[in-house]
Amino acid sequence: MPLEKGIAELVAGFIAAGRPSSREQNIDDRRAGYIASTSLADEKEIRVSSEDIVLEGMTFRVVSPPNASGSLPCILYYHGGCFVSGGFLTHDPQLRQLAWKSGCKVIAIQYRLAPEHTFPAAHDDAERGANIVYQYAEQLGIDRERITLAGDSAGGHLALVSALRLKSTAHWSPAKLLLIYPMLDATASFPSYASNGQDYIITRDTLLSGFEMYLQGTDLRHPEASPIWREDFAGLPPVHILTAEFDPLRDEGEALYHRLNDQGVACTCQRYLGVIHGFFQLGGVSQAVRSAMRDVAWRVVSPSTGKMT
C-alpha cells in the first residue's frame, strides 16, 4: 500500500532535505526536535484531567477520564524516543486520547535517558515505576488486577522487559501488554532495517544511534538489550503488538508475535498499512492513528483473540 497522503508529504520533505542524520545532531537538538514534532499530533483532548505526581522519588503523569470514580483499569505507559529523548511533553496528546477512549486511568513514567544515564538505568526505572504504581494502586484509584503495561518504540521495549522482570520475581503480573512498534533488536538483524531504513524519517541511523548511546558497550545480544531473542516468554500475560508497514522495526515486531505464540503466550499483532515508525503520534496527519487509538483503547478492556490481523 502507498504511504498515506499526509505521511507521504512528511517523507518527501525529509528526502528533499537530504535525509538529515540523527548522528549529526547534538542531544539537545534531537530532544527539541522531538518536542517540536508534537505539532503533528491530534488535537488536545481537554475532557480528561492530568496531573504530575511524585511517589517514592519518581515522577508520574496521571491522566484520568471524566467523572472517574472507584478503581479503574490502568494503562501504565512508557514513552518512546530511542532511549535518549521523549517524555510527558512528547506524549501528552496520546496519553489524553487513550484515557478518553478507554475510560481507564493512564499513568506515564518518566524514566532516565541516555546519554546521561546508560543501561540499565531506563530498565531499572521502568520496573521500579511499575512496582510503585502497583504499591500505590488504591491511592491512585486503580484496580491493581487490571494494570496494562504499554509503550511505543523504546517504551514498548521497556514494557516487555518490565513484564519479564516482574514474571521472574513472581510478585505481581500485569493483566496485558500493548507494544506499539517496539524496539527489540539492537543487532538490527531483520530485513525491514534495510528496506525501510533510509527514507522514512525515523531511520536505521535514528534507532541504532539511540541504542548505542544507551547501551554504551553492552553486548548487543544481552537479553535486556535485544529481548526478541529470549526463550523465557512463557508465562507472560496476553500481548498485542502494533507494527507499521514502512518501519525499520516492522519485522522484529512481527517476529516477536511468532516467538510469543511459539512459547505459549496469547498474542495478537496488527500491521498498519501506509504508515511509518512513530505514526501513533501523528494524529494530525494520519488516518490510521484514529483506528489504532480506538483499537488499543478497546484491547485494554477486552479479551485477546490470539490471532494476527
Regions found by a protein language model. Give the residues of each.
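A glycine/proline-hinged amphipathic helix-loop "lid/cap" segment
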Residues: 1-65, 305-309
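Short beta-strand element of the alpha/beta-hydrolase
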Residues: 71-81
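Short amphipathic alpha-helix adjacent to the substrate-entry channel of hydrolases
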Residues: 89-107
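Gly/Ser-rich "nucleophile elbow"/oxyanion-hole loop immediately N-terminal to the catalytic nucleophile
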Residues: 134-149
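Gly/Ala-rich beta-loop-alpha elbow adjacent to hydrolase catalytic centers
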Residues: 151, 155, 159
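Hydrolase active-site cap/lid region
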Residues: 164-219
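Short beta-strand/loop motif that positions the catalytic acidic residue
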Residues: 241-243
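Catalytic active-site module of serine/aspartate enzymes centered on a nucleophile-bearing elbow/loop
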Residues: 285-309
